[in-house]
A protein has these predicted regions:
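N-terminal short leaders/motifs
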Residues: 2-24, 122-153
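Active-site-proximal loop/helix segment associated with metal-binding centers of metalloenzymes
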Residues: 74-138
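Core catalytic region of metal-dependent phosphoesterases/phosphodiesterases
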Residues: 1-64
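Conserved beta-sheet core of the metallophosphoesterase superfamily
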Residues: 50-57, 70, 75, 79-95, ...
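Short amphipathic alpha-helical patches
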Residues: 45-49, 110, 114, 122-126, ...
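Short C-terminal domain-edge/linker segments immediately following a structured domain
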Residues: 24-29, 64-67, 99-106, 187-190
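Active-site beta-strand termini and strand-to-loop segments that position acidic
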Residues: 63-65, 169-170
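Hydrophobic positions within alpha-helical membrane elements
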Residues: 4, 42-43, 78, 109, ...
């Protein structure tokens, strides 16, 4: 979602067909996991109750086909930007969330969508910064630090940065950032 905020009685416009397809999958018994990120913090049960999604607010570690995966959106993991950390605390604060939800959906959704658009457009040509290299890419730095205490993980899989990255961090450990769903529609297959 570019911006998702659940109001008690309002479903955000523009996502009906997508939500319907997700519901179709879960109705057929297919698990759909959704990792909360910086554009969709404000989900309060609709995606679980109405669409059958399994919503994750934090990273998870799981075993699939004999391999150990660390799965996360990537939001808030290792980002050194103090302004971003402050904004993230405000966005995750339950009181601030209740106050925002008191705003009429017409204005609240417009504000959120415009904020997301502005955030994207302030980057060059509206696209994510290119890969910064192992020494400067904060998700790589986070992963390298995390591996020191959790060296049993085979794959780290993230979104958030909207860049394609497939990086071997050791003979055993591989890190992937899924890429850009807005321009390139990239994804990973295991």
């Amino acid at each position: 979602f570019d911006f998702w905020n659940e109001y008690r009685y309002v479903v955000p416009k523009g996502y009906t067909r997508f939500l319907g397809k997700l519901s179709e999958l879960t109705d057929r018994g297919i698990e759909v996991h959704f990792f909360i990120g910086n554009h969709d913090i404000w989900t309060y049960g609709y995606l679980e109750q109405e669409c059958g999604l399994i919503v994750h607010r934090k990273p998870i570690t799981t075993e699939l086909y004999g391999k150990v995966f660390f799965l996360a959106h990537g939001d808030g993991l290792g980002d050194p930007d103090n302004k971003f950390k402050l904004l993230r605390k405000i966005f995750h604060n339950p009181t601030c969330q209740r106050l925002f939800n008191a705003i009429h959906p017409r204005w609240g959704m417009a504000l959120g969508l415009n904020w997301a658009k502005h955030s994207r457009m302030k980057r060059e040509a509206g696209k994510e910064l290119p890969y910064l290299g192992e020494d400067k890419e904060y998700l790589v730095q986070f992963t390298k630090s995390y591996i020191k205490a959790h060296n049993d993980i085979d794959y780290f899989l993230y979104g958030h940065r909207h860049i394609e990255l497939d990086l071997m961090l050791s003979h055993k450990t591989r890190m992937l950032i899924l890429g850009d769903w807005i321009w390139q529609f990239t994804y990973a297959v295991f």
